[in-house]
């Protein structure tokens, strides 16, 4: 059981911090950057839960909005698990190369495969993609998009020192970004939101100047 009685130690005042084994490294160290990005993903997932819980799951007449309740249940369960897994991953990533303590509980193949199983279940409920999706939507959907992009940044950072970490950790993060993409689409569909699709340049409007002029003319 973790017991923390003091947070401020002054040990990081000069730009250094400790790895799990107590060794000191600069806060600009690539491994510390990775740990921080992992924490950033976790915080964004917390924001997804906040945004999801803001959506009313009752109709004006008091009846239950079944699809909204389902989104809340799935996100609370899945993201709650993911946040703990990311904490496990962050602890592992904060270890020096090839010096993971035997007592540490690590992300395993079952955790990684579970992401694929959940993706497959969600995809069964979705229409096939016919274009790229632009990152927009309501609070939970837009925040899921952001979490996905930060997860990709985490993956890119990990690749930079992949020889110093377990291949399974990198596999897990790669799958996690895909998982977030599919959950974003599933959440959008369950909330009856239209996805904003990419429009090729030849089909896009040239600008908004004409629209502004028409609006001004109709005042």
How would you describe each model-predicted region?
Residues 1-219:
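Phosphate/pyrophosphate-binding loop motifs in nucleotide- or prenyl diphosphate-using proteins
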């Amino acid at each position: 059981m973790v017991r923390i009685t003091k947070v401020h130690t002054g040990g990081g005042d000069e730009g250094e911090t400790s790895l799990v084994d107590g060794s000191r490294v600069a806060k600009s160290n690539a491994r510390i950057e990775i740990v921080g990005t992992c924490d950033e993903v976790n915080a964004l997932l917390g924001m997804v839960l906040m945004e999801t819980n803001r959506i009313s799951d009752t109709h004006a007449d008091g009846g239950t909005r079944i699809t909204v309740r389902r989104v809340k249940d799935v996100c609370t369960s899945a993201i709650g698990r993911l946040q703990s897994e990311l904490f496990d991953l962050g602890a592992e990533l904060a270890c020096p190369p090839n010096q993971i303590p035997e007592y540490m509980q690590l992300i395993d193949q079952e955790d990684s495969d579970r992401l694929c199983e959940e993706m497959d279940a969600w995809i069964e409920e979705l229409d096939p993609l016919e274009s790229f999706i632009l990152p927009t939507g309501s609070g939970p959907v837009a925040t899921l998009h952001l979490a996905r992009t930060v997860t990709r940044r985490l993956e890119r950072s990990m690749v930079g020192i992949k020889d110093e970490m377990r291949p399974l950790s990198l596999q897990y993060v790669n799958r996690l970004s895909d998982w977030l993409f599919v959950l974003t689409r599933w959440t959008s569909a369950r909330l009856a939101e239209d996805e904003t699709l990419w429009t090729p340049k030849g089909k896009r409007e040239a600008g908004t100047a004409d629209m502004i002029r028409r609006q001004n003319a109709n005042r």
